[in-house]
A protein has these predicted regions:
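Conserved AMP-binding/adenylation subdomain of ANL enzymes
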Residues: 6-45, 59
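Gly/Ser/Thr-rich phosphate-binding loop
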Residues: 18-21, 43-48, 57-128, 141-142, ...
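AMP-binding/adenylate-forming catalytic core of the ANL superfamily
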Residues: 38, 46, 165, 170-171, ...
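Glycine-centered tight turns that cap/initiate beta-strands
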Residues: 61, 69, 93, 139, ...
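Active-site glycine-centered loops adjacent to acidic/histidine catalytic or metal-binding residues
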Residues: 77, 101, 134, 192, ...
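Beta-strand->loop->alpha-helix junctions that form or flank phosphate-binding loops
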Residues: 97-104, 108, 134-135, 240-243, ...
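Conserved ATP/PPi-binding loop(s) of AMP-dependent carboxylate-activating enzymes
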Residues: 135-140, 151-181, 219
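Acidic/polar alpha-helix N-cap and adjacent early helical turns
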Residues: 306-315
Length: 315
């Protein structure tokens, strides 16, 4: 287990113990250590955020072995790029699965199984499902998409993911204002923007608070990050909006370079323009040694915005 056991990964660890299995606990997200355990300790279940999956796939030794014991490679914390799911299955086999969850929900909200993921990869008619995070689990009573006015939206329309059920938290300790904010209209508001398709599969666009408004357009950083992650020079990345007189917010990429990689800002911006068009492509890209992260490994975009607004030289 790489993730801290204070949240969802703790439930994963308990399930392993109930089944009579062994949990391999790691003090940090050490890529060399993860590879060592995968290649030597008959690991059957691996739980990683998408960013660590990306780093694993770029490691020069990850393709030196087969992984016949691995049954589940579970990702959570952020959507994972469809191209990386396909690449991961080529390396690890048909083991990729994904959940959408948050601590306030108590239990996983959605799940897509390895079988569903493999079927989506093999069938062009289902390939779009590689971009989803599954269907609602039985542990959540109800899941819907809501607009700003409390109206529930039909399939295909984007809005905030809202939840109901007995596992949902009653509120934030000693913070009635924050509790009221997330419990508007009788639903728990996840803070994630997404949509449901006709079959009930959930597709996440991005975190509501991370959306960039640039030149009058709503831009989701996740879409840009997934393009950046496909470039060989990028090890890790985050995209934020910084204050700009012309655009309101200027789309800005912050990257960690892959080992031995060189960086050409204009070439990387052009790479994004080819995939996304000029409006969504970053106006600038900054290199950093280490992206700021929380205790559970998530990039702290608020910190990035504050730092970049103070001047890129501070990164």
């Amino acid at each position: 287990c790489v993730a801290p056991i204070t949240h969802a990964s703790g439930l994963v660890c308990l399930g392993t113990l109930v089944a009579g299995g062994t949990n391999i606990m790691m003090a940090s997200a050490d890529i060399e250590g993860i590879i060592h355990h995968l290649q030597n300790d008959h690991v059957t279940n691996l739980f990683l955020p998408p960013t660590l999956v990306y780093v694993l796939l770029k490691h020069p030794r990850i393709r030196d072995s087969n992984y016949p014991d691995l049954r589940f490679l579970l990702t959570a914390g952020a959507p994972i790029a469809a191209e990386k799911i396909v690449e991961a299955m080529a390396v690890f086999g048909p083991v990729m699965c994904q959940v959408f969850a948050q601590s306030e929900a108590g239990m996983p909200v959605t799940f897509i199984s390895p079988g569903e993921t493999a079927a989506a990869s093999a069938d062009p008619a289902k390939r779009h499902l590689l971009q989803c995070c599954g269907k609602k689990t039985e542990m959540i009573e109800a899941m819907a998409i809501m607009d700003e006015n409390g109206k529930l939206l039909p399939a295909g329309e984007s809005g905030e993911v809202v939840l109901r059920g007995p596992t949902i938290m009653k509120g934030y300790l000693n913070d009635s204002k924050a509790t009221a904010e997330v419990q508007r209209f009788g639903w728990h508001h996840s803070g994630d923007i997404g949509y449901l398709d006709e079959e009930g599969y959930l597709f996440i666009n991005d975190r509501k608070r991370d959306m960039i408004i640039s030149g009058g357009f709503n831009i989701f950083p996740l879409e840009i990050e997934q393009v950046l992650f496909t470039h060989p020079c990028v090890q890790e990345c985050a995209v934020v909006g910084i204050v700009d007189d012309k655009w309101g917010e200027a789309v800005t990429g912050v990257i960690e370079l892959a080992p031995g990689a060189s960086f050409d800002e204009q070439e990387l911006i052009a790479f994004c323009k080819d995939a996304l068009g000029s409006m969504k492509a970053p106006k600038s890209i900054v290199v950093t040694d280490n992206l700021p992260r929380s205790a559970v490994g998530k990039v702290l975009k608020r910190n990035l915005r504050e730092t970049l607004n103070a001047g890129p030289a501070r990164i």
